[in-house]
């Protein structure tokens, strides 16, 4: 039995979010939370909320024991990109891509 939580279109690039995702993959849920609380990155705050949601889903929807939960999968995919322009000199404009991500955590009982 597995429990999952997903959040879509978060304003962080997938590349930066994957740095934090790699820290918690295959760890127990409690260990992953302690790692995230001690990681000073914007993505760690997003993953804390997501992991708490996945644990709550496991307990409430599937009746799992939260002491035995392990992070089975952490997926970080690219979302839609917001395209903006930065005015430059002599009438030029540079493109700015504000990237978004889709985040997903899958928990499994050990």
Curated annotation (Swiss-Prot):
What SUPFAM superfamilies does UniProt report for this protein, alphabetically?
Ribosomal protein L22
Origin: domain of life: Bacteria
Q: Which GO terms describe its biological process?
A: translation
* Molecular-function annotations in GO: rRNA binding; structural constituent of ribosome
Q: Which InterPro entries match?
A: Ribosomal_uL22, Ribosomal_uL22_bac/chlpt-type, Ribosomal_uL22_bac/org-type, Ribosomal_uL22_CS, Ribosomal_uL22_sf
Residue pairs linked by disulfide bridges in the UniProt entry: none
Q: Name one Pfam family in it.
A: Ribosomal_L22
Q: Which GO terms describe its cellular component?
A: cytosolic large ribosomal subunit
**Keywords annotated in UniProt:** Ribonucleoprotein, Ribosomal protein, RNA-binding, rRNA-binding
* Keyword Ribonucleoprotein applies: yes
Q: Which NCBIfam families match?
A: rplV_bact
- Biological role: This protein binds specifically to 23S rRNA; its binding is stimulated by other ribosomal proteins, e.g. L4, L17, and L20. It is important during the early stages of 50S assembly. It makes multiple contacts with different domains of the 23S rRNA in the assembled 50S subunit and ribosome.
Q: What's the family?
A: Belongs to the universal ribosomal protein uL22 family.
Concerning HAMAP family, the annotation shows:
Ribosomal_uL22_B (MF_01331_B)
Record text on subunit structure and interactions:
Part of the 50S ribosomal subunit.
Q: What name does the UniProt record give this protein?
A: Large ribosomal subunit protein uL22
